[in-house]
A protein has these predicted regions:
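Mid/C-terminal beta-alpha module of Rossmann-like enzyme folds, strongest
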Residues: 211, 215-235
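Conserved beta-loop-beta element that borders a ligand/cofactor-binding pocket
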Residues: 155-182
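N-terminal Rossmann NAD(P)H-binding glycine-rich loop of SDR-like oxidoreductase domains
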Residues: 10-38
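Conserved Rossmann-fold NAD(P)-dependent oxidoreductase catalytic core, especially the SDR/UDP-sugar
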Residues: 41, 102-147, 166
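Short-chain dehydrogenase/reductase
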Residues: 97-101, 138-158, 210-218
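NAD(P)H-binding glycine-rich loop region in Rossmannoid oxidoreductase-like domains
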Residues: 57-105
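Glycine/proline-rich active-site loop of Rossmann-fold NAD(P)-dependent oxidoreductases
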Residues: 175-192, 227-235
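A conserved pocket-lining segment of Rossmann-fold NAD(P)-dependent short-chain dehydrogenase/reductase
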Residues: 190-215
Length: 235
């Protein structure tokens, strides 16, 4: 049976963002920095990549390290009232499993149920069918990224903190540096557009029954910030 979320208290919000140096992470951190009074705990591997928010601001605490080694930041993680988990990995199957499955379990274990109100977990729309159910093919035939995201979602559905977890399923994400001076890192999709541009003329010869859905990282940040700063009573 899932643990009940604590009623919102007068304590100041402390929002932990993993993958805080990434595209979605930085858009989200910036939105919360500008539009809330929450203290931000930013977990990231390379603080030099953080450009969207001032790292030395009193409202920001940098937790520098790898998601696979959270013990040095156990006390800070336990103080979080909300979590926005954007960090992920793909490419190497073992690394994907450690980051996308094992590290998520460890992160949840370090949270304090007496303090935690909500976890916003980033999955992917690629593992869902049209009825928003988990695709069996995701586990059977997916890439290491798809398989580990599907495995993690299954684990979260039966986790003791399940009632406090909100899963979001982004589609194809645009965002980042398209004009000089933009402080946000470029999403992988946006970065690929420049390389693909010389070949776009070939698209007129292609026909497909598939559909593609796009979203900008700034819009994802707005949604996540709204969720993370609104009263939450559990699923």
């Amino acid at each position: 049976m899932s643990a009940q979320a604590p009623a919102p208290a007068s304590r100041a919000a402390r929002i932990l963002i993993t993958g805080a140096a990434g595209c979605v992470g930085q858009y989200t951190a910036e939105h919360l920095y500008r539009h809330s009074d929450a203290h931000l705990l930013l977990l990231l591997r390379d603080p030099s990549k953080l450009k969207a928010v001032p790292a030395n601001d009193p409202r920001i605490t940098l937790l520098v390290g790898d998601l696979r080694d959270l013990e040095p930041h156990a006390a800070a993680i336990a103080s979080a009232t909300r979590v926005i988990h954007t960090a992920t990995a793909w490419g190497d199957p073992e690394r994907a499993h450690q980051v996308n499955v094992v590290a998520v379990k460890r992160l949840l274990a370090l949270l304090d149920p007496a303090v935690l109100e909500q976890v916003i977990y980033f999955s992917t729309a690629s593992i869902l069918n049209r009825q928003l159910e988990l695709l069996p093919e995701a586990m059977a035939y997916g890439t290491e990224y798809i398989q580990t995201k599907a495995q993690c979602l299954q684990d979260l559905e039966v986790h003791p903190l399940a009632e406090r977890i909100v899963a979001v399923f982004p589609t194809l994400v645009f965002g980042g540096r398209v004009v000089p001076g933009d402080p946000h890192p470029t999403s992988y999709l946006t970065a690929g557009v420049k390389e693909a541009f010389p070949w776009l003329w070939l698209a007129k010869w292609l026909r497909t029954d598939a559909s593609f859905h796009f979203i900008h990282a700034a819009d994802i940040a707005t949604v996540c910030a709204h969720l993370a700063t609104s009263p939450y009573r559990g699923n």
